[in-house]
Amino acid sequence: MSEYIRVTEDENDEPIEIPSEDDGTVLLSTVTAQFPGACGLRYRNPVSQCMRGVRLVEGILHAPDAGWGNLVYVVNYPKDNKRKMDETDASSAVKVKRAVQKTSDLIVLGLPWKTTEQDLKEYFSTFGEVLMVQVKKDLKTGHSKGFGFVRFTEYETQVKVMSQRHMIDGRWCDCKLPNSKQSQDEPLRSRKVFVGRCTEDMTEDELREFFSQYGDVMDVFIPKPFRAFAFVTFADDQIAQSLCGEDLIIKGISVHISNAEPKHNSNRQLERSGRFGGNPGGFGNQGGFGNSRGGGAGLGNNQGSNMGGGMNFGAFSINPAMMAAAQAALQSSWGMMGMLASQQNQSGPSGNNQNQGNMQREPNQAFGSGNNSYSGSNSGAAIGWGSASNAGSGSGFNGGFGSSMDSKSSGWGM
């Protein structure tokens, strides 16, 4: 007749009753069925209080001389398996410890001037235990700057506070991580979406009810005065991102959902994209190179505002390195032409070139860099190039080169 013996993994644990065979033995397979990896049993001797092992022969556990009795038997494990189990427990404990997120300082924006640190602490204490609050003040006047900092004990409290807007002393305030806490290389995954094309009859409660079908809505904000848009903040950033770009129907009106990205992030993206423009004298629509007195060559959509009659090359893309190389090449090539013209002028009767044809006087068109002040005194239609502070007038001849030695200016007469 079989009986049940009490077996446990540790002496202090609650035992499990395991059935024995008809001959009074216990199969090791019966033990391993309840304690995987077990290789034997042991028990504490009531007389000596020492641990004794149970005899094991070919997978069969034999009862002690006095029988199984009411003793509690402890399971034995191989040492290697026990070591592995201990290491697994230790590694899992380390992983759990690393998974615990630490809290950090949160910046509170839009604080009323009258709000004190005590007011701030009392408000945020309703969410959880507050470690620190601080209202930034002007060193000279001692007045509030309109923002402060707060830190909580629990990370869950921090997440909850960041997921919603806060009415503090009659004013809406935002609480978020400072910019220094966010990596610029990581993409910003916002939980807030922009809802465009809203109508005045849409209320915050209606928007909250509508968007609740997609996920938990933490906050709904409609700016006042009404400007035909609203902001909806979800608890999960993945839900917010999945709705971006969608056109949804609310109360029979089509609204467009997009990412509510802060302005400073948009500016950062424009800076990283390498675009030039928007500044006087730069690339783009606000002027260009060559705003000099001698007439410059403008890049982009310039309106020809140079004093010397600058010419535009159209709206094409060019970088500063290319422009500098082009200017250097032009100065070098035209300088060589000027030297050739000077040599020809020195071989003339008096160094003064006369126009050999009956050419009509026409205004010059000049390309220049620096403070060139060419005057239109060339005989014939001349396109003059000059550099440095030339103050004279270059005399050209038909189909050749012309130069004035007195003013050290050179021109190409055409």
UniProtKB/Swiss-Prot annotation:
Disulfide bonds: none
Subunit structure: Homodimer. Homooligomer (via its N-terminal domain). Interacts with BRDT. Binds specifically to pyrimidine-rich motifs of TAR DNA and to single stranded TG repeated sequences. Binds to RNA, specifically to UG repeated sequences with a minimum of six contiguous repeats. Interacts with ATXN2; the interaction is RNA-dependent. Interacts with MATR3. Interacts with UBQLN2. Interacts with HNRNPA2B1. Interacts with ZNF106. Interacts with CNOT7/CAF1. Interacts with CRY2.
Domain comment, as recorded: Consists of an N-terminal domain (NTD) and two tandem RNA recognition motifs, RRM1 and RRM2, followed by a C-terminal glycine-rich region. Contains a nuclear localization sequence and is mostly nuclear; however, its nuclear export sequence permits it to transport mRNAs to the cytoplasm and even to synapses as part of neuronal granules.
Segments of skewed composition (Gly residues): 275-303
Region (Disordered): 261-303, 341-373
Motif (Nuclear export signal): 239-250
Key words, A-Z: Amyotrophic lateral sclerosis, Biological rhythms, Cytoplasm, Disease variant, DNA-binding, Isopeptide bond, Methylation, Mitochondrion, mRNA processing, mRNA splicing, Neurodegeneration, Nucleus, Phosphoprotein, Repeat, Repressor, RNA-binding, Transcription, Transcription regulation, Ubl conjugation
PTM section of the record: Hyperphosphorylated in hippocampus, neocortex, and spinal cord from individuals affected with ALS and FTLDU. Phosphorylated upon cellular stress. Ubiquitinated in hippocampus, neocortex, and spinal cord from individuals affected with ALS and FTLDU.
UniProt keyword Acetylation present: no
Record annotation: effect of changing residue 348 to V: In ALS10; loss of interaction with PPIA/CYPA
A cellular component annotation (GO) from this entry: chromatin
InterPro entries: Nucleotide-bd_a/b_plait_sf, RBD_domain_sf, RRM_dom, TDP-43_C, TDP-43_N
Gene3D superfamilies, sorted: 3.30.70.330
Mutagenesis / variant outcome for changing residue 331 to K: In ALS10; triggers mitochondrial DNA release into the cytosol, which is then detected by CGAS, leading to activation of the cGAS-STING pathway and autoinflammation; impedes the development of normal limb and tail buds and increases the number of apoptotic nuclei when expressed in chick embryos; does not affect the interaction with ATXN2
Biased composition (Low complexity): 342-358
GO biological process, one term: regulation of protein stability
Physiological role: RNA-binding protein that is involved in various steps of RNA biogenesis and processing. Preferentially binds, via its two RNA recognition motifs RRM1 and RRM2, to GU-repeats on RNA molecules predominantly localized within long introns and in the 3'UTR of mRNAs. In turn, regulates the splicing of many non-coding and protein-coding RNAs including proteins involved in neuronal survival, as well as mRNAs that encode proteins relevant for neurodegenerative diseases. Plays a role in maintaining mitochondrial homeostasis by regulating the processing of mitochondrial transcripts.
Name of the protein described by the UniProt record: TAR DNA-binding protein 43
Tissue expression pattern: Ubiquitously expressed. In particular, expression is high in pancreas, placenta, lung, genital tract and spleen.
RRM domain segment(s): 104-200, 191-262
Compartments where located: Nucleus; Cytoplasm; Cytoplasm, Stress granule; Mitochondrion
Effect of mutating residue 48 to E: Complete loss of self-oligomerization
Positions of transmembrane segments: none
GO molecular function, one term: DNA binding
Region ranges (Interaction with UBQLN2): 216-414
Modified positions (Phosphoserine) in chain numbering: 183, 292
